[in-house]
């Protein structure tokens, strides 16, 4: 382990935070697919997206799981080799995931749920921006 800049420490911490949260969420969707399908089918029942629940759940599950793995793998790479590329890739995948989740929450008129996602999205964008400033 070498010396890290403040930006690199922030990248590691945000990558760790997002990696844990998103990998857990993606894993939960895989383990409890039936429960998640039931919840989302009801959640989107009164929207034009009701027939898209299965593909939406599949996309979100892949984005969360891949984003989480990239971030956690990236943290390991950063600590072992001072290579931060995987964290950035994970954050980009996770940012797209949050946009998809936000759209779903808004279309289902779950405004409180959409509002909660804003904090995670901002954190993710801050993490991405640390690579460029």
Model-inferred region functions:
Residues 1-28, 58, 62-133:
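Extended, low-polarity transmembrane helix blocks
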